[in-house]
């Protein structure tokens, strides 16, 4: 087993009370200076630990002093930072797309904690010295190298000692008009979860994250490497914030619009968000992702620095836009975490929401102080969203082979050669898994999967995943495995929603639901007479497009062309305009068009 490297920081600490220095984070008016020196750890018998096979160690420890007291900082490489099929895309001056798969597994981005402190954490980049932050005795400290010739000096300081870039409060443009009523949230927060729901919430979930940098932000950086480093640091920080929600964020791709922007960039954040969502919907399969964010150098109108659709995981709208408004990486990452929270079904915190280290991530104002954690309101609202919508893409966990570099016991990833991995000795709460060896305890068959209870396989025919609706099927444990079988769906054509529709690929598409989705709850499907317009074959009313021409519907197929809606208690024919793309105004495939008939390829055919 490769032993952890012990690195001791031999300190000469010089408090600079009242002094000021310009660091990467800005003007810092009070800091301490430390001088790191690496010392190899010794194995038993006094033998020196061999040189690592990779440039950066998988685990490290740093010993130093904070306020005159010694601390030991444990670091573990964030092995899941990049997905197995991570790609980077940029564009040549002539517009040619250049996509590569760089070797990123031997990276220098770490998570960690302070030894003997239960409520501690750390996010560190060790690429060129130590840069990041750690929480110690309830206080957050930042560390970064000092740019002094022939010196390994680092500065340690608190956030309160960084002069603010701009006193104007920033905002997220998601407004209260998109919230549910307080009454409905209060009612759901009082509900008790079923055992099946609790099991679902406890299952580890994953976001395959795609990040895009626009042309202006690209031009604002001196080199591609500087830009990549900044992005990696943001995602490393983002990853730690979602641990409480039991999510792991894996960067699946970075795209830099180095030649020109691929969408219309507009100071109106809502316009840019819509354009970005439309662009993402057309990405090729090799750039698939669960969520995408656009980082932009443009200045959004007013004090807006971010915007996202709410409750859109695993859909076309799982996107956000964030303005590159601060040179401080942690502030940018805080805003990214905030916008991703909206995609995960979380609204802004209300006045009665609290977290132990304010401001909370979903605060309605984005200040110059970093966000550190979700409030209890956010956690509960996110859980209600997951239980209500059951987004499927987040359950696709990386295979063991996706971890290309050497396995590390204690990183919460079950890798090749491991039977379980419950985290570090400090974090592990499992009675089934040995945190030191990542092997099951002698009495255990399993650890924490859906078909595991008290370290034993659940009996055959024990339900492990309930049917979420008419078009889903329940899954049952086999009695031979801890894994719940793959999610299975009701057959296409099975009646659903009281015969209002027929199942199609796990959903129950109806015209009424499509109108509500596109226009809101005050709308329903239009009268039958509206659909006769589809016989025209004009730009608005038609059945399909062929080589740019609008093809009219036959009379029997008129309900399989353009969708018509109407406002409840009113008359008229309304063609909805989707923020996704113009084609989504068409009646969706699989929608019921007559009794025992559904739309297929713009025709009304038998089920």
From Swiss-Prot:
Residues carrying sugar: 220, 270, 301, 434, 522
UniProt KW Glycoprotein keyword: yes
Removed propeptide positions: 21-196
Keyword terms, alphabetized: Calcium, Cell adhesion impairing toxin, Disulfide bond, Glycoprotein, Hemostasis impairing toxin, Hydrolase, Metal-binding, Metalloprotease, Platelet aggregation inhibiting toxin, Protease, Secreted, Signal, Toxin, Zinc, Zymogen
Cofactor: Zn(2+)
Cofactor note: Binds 1 zinc ion per subunit.
Highest taxon listed in the record's lineage: Eukaryota
Record-listed Ca(2+) 3 binding positions: 472-473, 475, 487-488
Keyword Calcium attached: yes
Primary location class: secreted
Residue stretches making up the Peptidase M12B domain: 205-398
Chain sites annotated for binding Ca(2+) 2: 411, 413, 415, 418, 421
Gene3D superfamilies membership: Collagenase (Catalytic Domain) (3.40.390.10), Disintegrin domain (4.10.70.10)
Enzyme class label: hydrolase
GO cellular component: extracellular region; plasma membrane
Family (UniProt): Belongs to the venom metalloproteinase (M12B) family. P-III subfamily. P-IIIa sub-subfamily.
The protein, known as: Zinc metalloproteinase-disintegrin-like atrase-A
Organism: Naja atra (Chinese cobra)
Lineage: Eukaryota, Metazoa, Chordata, Craniata, Vertebrata
